[in-house]
Amino acid sequence: MSGGPGRLRGYAMVGGSAVMFGATGVWVGMTDLPASTVLSLRMALAAALVALFGGASRWRRQSRAPGVGRRLLALGLLDVVQLYTFFLALRHLDVALAVFLSYMSPIYIALVSPRLLRQRTEPVVVVALVLAVSGVIVMLSPGLLDPALRLSVPGLAAGVLSGVTLAAFFLVAKTLSADVDGSTMLISNGVIVAVVMLPLGLIQWAGGGFPFVLTDFWAVLGLAVFSTALGGTVFLHGMRYIPVQHTSIVGLLEPACAPFFAFVFLAERPSLWTLLGGALILAGAVLVVLFGAAQDGLAGTPEEAVGEAEATS
């Protein structure tokens, strides 16, 4: 692996956080509360926890830097749109297709980051991207190939927008990572998402007559602590050490690890498709970690990278 200890730290932080994110489905499965209610509680609690454990002073200091406040606001609003459109896609499409469209964000990042961030697309990124995205397709193939697959134009539009806004979130977070800590991004993000989602969350919770039971508390706490406060802060901070294209590929360890947590905590046996897809995603992540270039700001395009890969093969 090229690069120094900081680069290794970045891969460890992003990869470790992605593994933690893989348990999100377990926490969500513990509660019957409306998604908007869970989101607002989760993000508000996560922001409060990070602020309480030392992030508040950094947030106040760093958010006042020139140009940072606007980007923090944009980051939070992108997260709101991404989360909302993903849930809309889940409502109008089968789960497999909604997840597939959302996880297309690494492709969008590979296409635009050379032009927006001046980050060269390496040949190894092209290979790793093909492996990782193929892994997602293989994992979801039983649902995607189902003749009864549920389709709708609004659902497809929401799914594509979810993937695009997730890519935009990564790109904006990358521009912020040189100026602020992961805790600052997490606090701002949590507050913005909670404020926007709270009215809808309260309306759906009160209107549906949902009781708030102990399992709901543990679910929200688990999501807030592991999937957001801890995992989110570490992930966002780790982005500063590695190229954003690498971040999006290593981040796909999340769906690869989700079946492991489902097996351990819910006794759900993974299928052969799931295991094969997870292996492909892992192979893609390992490629960028071991063979990714250390330079973070060279210019280049995916087309040039493909040409390099063909020339060296």
Predicted regions and their residues:
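Glycine-/small-residue-enriched transmembrane alpha-helix faces in small-molecule transporters
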Residues: M1-S40, L77, T85, A148-T175, ...
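Membrane-interface capping segments at transmembrane-helix boundaries
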Residues: W59-R60, V289-E303
